[in-house]
């Protein structure tokens, strides 16, 4: 019975891995916006997926991205922080390919950051790198944001962006803490 319950719990957790929208926090690092009470950028959704992308959870990624798109009507770019994706199978590849088609056909761009060597080898072997575009795959989220942010924001839109300045969510008002121009580090998230 214990082994069966453990297996069931493992399968459930594998089907719904941790996934979070990230935003800049007071330590100049990207953290889970919900947990840290941070506002997210309305134009760029920085999404971290923590787990292998395989048959048991690929539809979950697709559902979550669809939900993010629905809840962010001004969304222009999705950055999938991939440090936590340690493996990908054929279902995961197919989901990623379809996801790229869907978001780009809706006028939203998609990039990856922090892709590990194992996953990158699979993406290259299956020609997904060509579909994504090498210029849309970054070594870490900070390098990605430096490239994406300027292209995605127009003029005044960048002034109080939660990816450049710490912006807390509050029930009454938004409290903004202007730091420097965002993350200084090239460390991964």
Which sequence ranges carry the predicted segments?
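Flexible hinge motifs at transmembrane-helix junctions and intramembrane kinks/re-entrant loops
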Residues: 1-22
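Cytosolic C-terminal regulatory domains/tails of membrane transporters and channels
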Residues: 15-189
């Amino acid at each position: 019975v214990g082994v069966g319950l453990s297996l069931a719990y493992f399968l459930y957790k594998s089907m719904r891995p941790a996934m979070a929208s990230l935003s800049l926090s007071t330590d100049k690092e990207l953290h889970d916006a919900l947990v840290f009470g941070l506002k997210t950028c309305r134009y760029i959704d920085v999404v971290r997926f923590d787990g292998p992308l395989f048959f048991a959870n690929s539809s979950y990624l697709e559902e979550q991205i669809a939900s993010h798109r629905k809840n962010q009507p001004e969304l222009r770019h999705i950055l999938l922080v991939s440090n936590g994706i340690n493996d990908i199978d054929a279902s995961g590849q197919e989901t990623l390919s379809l996801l790229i088609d869907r978001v780009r056909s809706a006028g939203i761009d998609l990039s990856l950051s922090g892709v590990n060597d194992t996953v990158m080898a699979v993406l290259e072997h299956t020609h997904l790198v060509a579909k994504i575009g090498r210029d849309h795959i970054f070594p870490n989220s900070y390098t990605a944001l430096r490239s994406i942010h300027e292209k995605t924001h127009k003029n005044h839109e960048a002034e109080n962006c939660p990816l450049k300045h710490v912006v807390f969510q509050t029930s009454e008002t938004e409290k903004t803490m202007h730091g420097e121009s965002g993350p200084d580090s090239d460390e991964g998230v």
